[in-house]
Amino acid sequence: MVQTWKFPANWSTSELAEGRVRSEQLFRKERKEEGPRAFEEVYREVEPRVREALEVTGDLLNLDGQAFIYDPTIWRILRYVCAPPVSEEDLWTLVGQKFRTVPADLCDETAEVIREVLDPVRFAWVAEGRQPNETERESAVMATSALLALELLRTRRRGTASKRQEAEVAAALEGIGYVLDAKRGDIDVLDVLERGHFSKERKVAGAKCDVPIRLKDGRLLAIECKVSNGPKNSWKRLIRECGGKSETWRQHFGTQVMSVAVLAGSFDLSCLERAQNMDGLWVYWQHDLKALTDFIETIA
């Protein structure tokens, strides 16, 4: 008997546009509700750490390797006294080694790298070789804390939003009788995951998959959860990240895998059409997971 596979429906342009509008509405509502309050909370969290960094380094006038011996994690704060702030990877490249805490033999070199790119606007007194006055110090603390809080808030938002998506997808699957497989090992062959089961954050054919699902007909449904904060960002999230993984999984499993992107936030309409029509992805929205579970329930 010839197996007839069922596939999700491709959405029309108007259907994609409708889902996109609703997703953006929810995104804006959430940002407005959490924005200032969330930023203030993170600012108040990091501001004492910025003050401590200035205190330990004598207002950056005595920034040397001893600062990292005193606190090997203070480099995460001191990245933000640079102009512009130095990313973790850039600092590792400049120092010549990746680290979580500064190794003792790299303390002096790390201090030198940071000294060479200190912000001359926020910390003008360093170049002038003098102590800052109270106004200068407070302005520098405020500006540096704001930079750090902004970056930390963005990072946390991405992580929190993704975890929330994964949790909602998992709840929806359990609601239709699928069972969570808590194992974390790689999925290189289909039978690693039982039919009617799903997992969270497992490598599938070498690429991390947010929610891999073994459908009841034996195929693998690989779900990626993506949040985009704007149309430009959506191309990176959907086409480059999801599209790249989709191709990897197709090469490994062939017709036995389907790739789905569960989306929230702001996405360019042409990006959605490209993903669906050219990159072998099926698109669903976080605000309408019933459409996804309705499809899964058609597969016996």
Spans of model-derived segments:
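Basic, amphipathic alpha-helical patches used to engage nucleic acids or provide basic targeting signals
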Residues: 234-254, 276
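Conserved catalytic cores of phosphodiester-cleaving nucleases, focusing on short active-site segments
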Residues: 211-213, 217-229, 242
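Solvent-exposed, charged helical/coil patches
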Residues: 147-186
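Short beta-strand-loop-alpha-helix junction that forms the active-site gateway
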Residues: 224-239, 264
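Surface-exposed cleft-lining segments at the edges of enzyme active sites
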Residues: 149-158, 194-199, 229-233
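Domain-level recognition of nuclease-like catalytic cores that cleave nucleotide substrates
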Residues: 257-300
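Nuclease-adjacent, charged terminal/linker segments that flank catalytic cores
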Residues: 1-139, 148, 152
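Active-site metal-binding core of divalent-cation-utilizing nuclease and nuclease-like domains
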Residues: 182-216
